[in-house]
Swiss-Prot record:
PROSITE patterns named among the record's database cross-references: RIBOSOMAL_L22
Family matches, as CDD domains: Ribosomal_L22
UniProt subunit comment: Part of the 50S ribosomal subunit.
GO biological process: translation
Keyword terms: Ribonucleoprotein, Ribosomal protein, RNA-binding, rRNA-binding
Gene Ontology annotations for the cellular component aspect, listed alphabetically: cytosolic large ribosomal subunit
Pfam family membership, one: Ribosomal_L22
Domain of life: Bacteria
Organism: Paenarthrobacter aurescens (strain TC1)
Family affiliation: Belongs to the universal ribosomal protein uL22 family.
The keyword rRNA-binding appears for this protein: yes
Protein name: Large ribosomal subunit protein uL22
UniProt cross-references to Gene3D superfamilies, sorted A to Z: Ribosomal protein L22/L17 (3.90.470.10)
Length: 121
């Protein structure tokens, strides 16, 4: 069984979010939650929420299909961060100049699956 969760337009730069996602890629879901809970990076909070959502989606799919479900069976099979739209702002500077400030956003995607699905690939 495979479940997916996506968070779009998250106000964190993709590079910083990728640092956090790389920490949990391939890990067991409950272990990843523990890692994210104590990670000092600000991007760990949205990744934590996406992982919780993916686990909840897996639970709903299992209930719908009538399959036995256990959180400890889930592993993160795919985890990636794509760049979202960039908000452009201007910072006034001396002598009539202006610097462009780019406020970057991210799309965070996590896929969790049970080991049977992982072996079938």
């Amino acid at each position: 069984m495979e479940a997916k969760a996506i968070a779009r337009h998250i106000r964190v730069t993709p590079m910083k979010a990728r640092r956090v996602v790389n920490l949990v890629r391939g890990k067991q879901a409950n272990e990843a939650l523990a890692i994210l809970k104590f990670a000092p990076q600000a991007a760990s909070e949205p990744v934590f929420k996406v992982l919780q959502s993916a686990m909840a989606n897996a639970r709903v799919l299992a209930d719908r299909d009538g399959v036995a479900f256990d959180d400890s069976d889930l592993f993160i099979t795919e985890a990636f961060v794509d760049e979202g739209p960039t908000m452009k702002r201007f910072q006034p500077r001396a002598q009539g100049r202006a610097y462009r400030i780019r406020k970057r956003t991210s799309h965070i995607t996590l896929v969790v699956a049970t080991p049977e699905k992982e072996e079938a690939r």
